[in-house]
């Protein structure tokens, strides 16, 4: 919603201010200049990035528009799954725990948290490290170092669309100048025309410079910033898993270990301790009620 509101304010102020100065709106309508700038920017974007990053950039923009960040229910689902697994680690046999992590789709623990099960990467992350805990030979600081390395790699991959879109946005002002120069070249071909005709042609050419700047600083870079915000918040789920499991490996009981994970959540989004306790008593309770 913020993106839509921001775009309305941006274009409303630019176009409204221009018309209030007495400008004519039809002069700004230059579809071929937009084609030059947008096409050159998109072509460079495709050349500069692997197809996987190109596709992920489209997905990331969709997430930014929908603001697909974890909500309280998502955090509670993660904490609920971790609590159930840690409880079973203390009370049940290795075979029973392996049944959950080998086939999470069929596990009652993961089925109670559909938002976790839907996130295949996060589910795999949880299962991999619970499996290492079951083995029992690894020390907590070794697991923590391994987790840090994987989490850093995941974040690096998740932010590739941000860097790719930012780079494309930074190129638009220069591409806008290219479009403007091409417009001036066209105008020079009619140098013998009247000043009214030449003025219109040169004005149309200058629209290219304006479009390049607007595409960069008012559209592309703000969208990239929103992509970074969304992807970074999604990444927070991995930090919760890491802090919780490491606390458990260091000797904390499951209830206390959950607090290590809960405290990593931003104050604006952190579920209350009462909500977490309710989740421990009834994992996925809200989902079942729904």
UniProtKB/Swiss-Prot annotation:
Pfam families linked to this entry: MotA_ExbB (PF01618), MotA_N (PF20560)
Keyword Cell membrane (UniProt): yes
Keyword set, alphabetical order: Cell inner membrane, Cell membrane, Chemotaxis, Flagellar rotation, Hydrogen ion transport, Ion transport, Membrane, Transmembrane, Transmembrane helix, Transport
Transmembrane intervals: 3-23, 27-47, 165-185, 197-217
Main location: membrane
Topology in the lipid bilayer: Multi-pass membrane protein
Keyword RNA-binding: no
Signal peptide: none
Subcellular location: Cell inner membrane
BP term (GO), one: proton transmembrane transport
GO cellular component, one term: plasma membrane
Subunit structure, interactors included: Each stator complex is composed of 4 MotA and 2 MotB subunits. 2 A subunits and 1 B subunit are thought to form a single ion channel, so that each stator complex contains two channels.
Assigned protein family: Belongs to the MotA family.
Record function comment: MotA and MotB comprise the stator element of the flagellar motor complex. Required for rotation of the flagellar motor. Probable transmembrane proton channel.
Protein name, per record: Motility protein A
Gene (UniProt): motA
């Amino acid at each position: 919603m913020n993106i839509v509101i921001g775009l309305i304010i941006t274009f409303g102020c630019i176009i409204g201010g221009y018309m209030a100065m007495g400008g004519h709106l039809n002069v700004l309508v230059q579809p071929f200049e937009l084609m030059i700038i947008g096409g050159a920017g998109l072509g460079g974007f495709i050349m500069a990035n692997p197809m996987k990053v190109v596709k992920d950039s489209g997905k990331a923009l969709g997430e930014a528009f929908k603001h697909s960040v974890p909500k309280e229910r998502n955090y509670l689902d993660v904490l609920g799954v971790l609590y159930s697994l840690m409880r079973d680690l203390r009370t049940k046999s290795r075979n029973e725990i392996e049944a959950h992590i080998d086939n999470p789709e069929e596990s009652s623990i993961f089925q109670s948290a559909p938002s976790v099960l839907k996130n295949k990467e996060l589910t795999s992350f949880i299962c991999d490290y619970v499996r290492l805990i079951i083995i029992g030979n690894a020390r907590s600081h070794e697991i923590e170092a391994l987790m840090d390395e994987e989490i850093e790699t995941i974040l690096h991959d998740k932010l590739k669309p941000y860097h790719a879109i930012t780079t494309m946005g930074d190129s638009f002002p220069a591409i806008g100048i290219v479009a403007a120069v091409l417009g001036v070249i066209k105008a020079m071909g009619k140098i013998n025309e009247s000043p009214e005709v030449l003025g219109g042609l040169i004005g149309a050419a200058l629209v290219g410079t304006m479009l390049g700047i607007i595409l960069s600083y008012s559209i592309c870079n703000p969208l990239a910033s929103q992509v970074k915000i969304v992807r970074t918040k999604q990444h927070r789920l991995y930090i919760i898993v890491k802090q919780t499991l490491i606390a458990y490996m260091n000797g904390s009981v499951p209830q206390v270990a959950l607090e290590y994970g809960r405290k990593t959540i931003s104050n604006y989004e952190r579920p209350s301790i009462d909500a977490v306790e309710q989740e421990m008593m009834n994992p996925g309770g809200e989902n079942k009620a729904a």
